[in-house]
């Protein structure tokens, strides 16, 4: 009995830590704004004709949706889009529509400079610069691990900001790894 209790007390902080990390990630993604290149699906419970699967958003980031017509998705969160569709269907077509929007695929981030395989890569929730470099094949021999810059897609000034390898990467970000001279 004592062994089981000791094991439970030892394991509990780890389990709670994992839950907290997942909750923090989910919270960050709840603020995620849709944009060109994202792939989304829309479902309305019990209404198969209103289901739209894996729609890749174009540069205009609009979709044609039954009953509602053209809907602009760019800059909206999943919650905002669900509310927009729910409000549009409620009363006109359904009494209490249950709308679910899922992001199937996030738009890419880009990495260049002293990287083995520069280019665009699909974003993954929880992505850091370190993980992005790994996805791109790692640093080249002459890469500076301290001179790493990000241009954030959502920054109106498009300013290049110096970051470390633990910095968070967002969809649409451009990462540049500079060359080390020594």
Question: What do the predicted segments below correspond to?
Answer:
Residues 2, 20-182:
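Ser/Thr/Pro/Gly-biased, low-complexity, turn-/loop-rich segments
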Residues 8-17:
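Bacterial N-terminal signal peptides
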Residues 1-7:
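Bacterial N-terminal signal peptides that target proteins for export
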């Amino acid at each position: 009995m004592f062994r089981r209790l000791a094991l439970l007390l030892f394991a509990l902080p780890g389990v709670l830590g994992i839950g907290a990390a997942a909750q923090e990630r989910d919270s960050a993604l709840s603020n995620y704004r849709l944009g060109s290149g994202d792939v989304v699906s829309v479902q309305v419970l019990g209404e198969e004709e209103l289901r739209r699967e894996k729609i890749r958003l174009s540069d205009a980031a609009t979709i044609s949706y039954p009953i509602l017509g053209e809907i602009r998705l760019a800059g909206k969160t999943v919650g905002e889009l669900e509310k927009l569709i729910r409000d549009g269907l409620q009363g006109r077509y359904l009494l209490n529509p249950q709308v679910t929007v899922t992001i199937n695929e996030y738009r890419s981030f880009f990495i260049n400079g002293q990287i083995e395989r520069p280019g665009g890569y699909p974003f993954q929730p929880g992505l850091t610069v370190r993980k992005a470099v790994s996805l791109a094949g790692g640093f080249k021999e002459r890469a500076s691990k301290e001179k790493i810059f990000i241009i954030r897609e959502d920054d109106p000034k498009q300013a290049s900001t110096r970051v470390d390898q633990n910095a968070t990467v967002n969809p649409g970000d451009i990462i540049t790894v500079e060359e080390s001279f020594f």
